């Protein structure tokens, strides 16, 4: 049974919802799944002024904070981040930047990797974010898994990974589940 880590950053809960759907899909695919979040770097007094954050704070905080060194313990890692100006959030970037030692020791080489994102605007740069999130995975020598051609992609997601605009709709969640299941199936074949 493949072990999969779904790791995400979210402030308003949209990326968290996708993370949960990705995890559900991976479980459907027969994997053992952990869902964790990256450390938040925005000061609490700033976050508390965001009504979207206040609504989901307790649920967000219920997820354990991941540590970079634990990535090596999984067969597959699926990274999720909100889109910020066409790239991943600084919190996710900082977390990935802390994987330098794993890179030097080639600890993630051969592991399966995939990505997902959410943003607030239809043209906010989701595909650019997905592509930029894949670059560190390539640098680590990970085996990248995207989404195959599917009718669901006509309305939601991208070949590069799952994506949503605003609160994820049912189509978005279905594509996220497809991604999780596909990663689980590929990881199982490689284990």
Swiss-Prot record:
Top enzyme class: oxidoreductase
MF-aspect GO terms: electron transfer activity; FMN binding; NADH:ubiquinone reductase (non-electrogenic) activity; NADPH dehydrogenase (quinone) activity
UniProt keyword list: Flavoprotein, FMN, NAD, Nucleotide-binding, Oxidoreductase
Needed co-factor(s): FMN
Superkingdom of source: Archaea
Signal peptide from the UniProt entry: none
Entries under Gene3D superfamilies matching the protein: 3.40.50.360
PROSITE patterns: FLAVODOXIN, FLAVODOXIN_LIKE
Catalysed reaction, written as an equation: a quinone + NADH + H(+) = a quinol + NAD(+); a quinone + NADPH + H(+) = a quinol + NADP(+)
EC number: 1.6.5.2
Co-factor remark: Binds 1 FMN per monomer.
Binding site for FMN: 10-15, 83-85, 118-124
Flavodoxin-like domain: residues covered: 4-184
GO CC aspect terms: membrane
Stated role: It seems to function in response to environmental stress when various electron transfer chains are affected or when the environment is highly oxidizing. It reduces quinones to the hydroquinone state to prevent interaction of the semiquinone with O2 and production of superoxide. It prefers NADH over NADPH.
Subunit structure: Homodimer and homotetramer; in equilibrium.
Family: Belongs to the WrbA family.
Name of the protein in question: NAD(P)H dehydrogenase (quinone)
Lineage, top ranks: Archaea, Methanobacteriati, Methanobacteriota, Archaeoglobi, Archaeoglobales
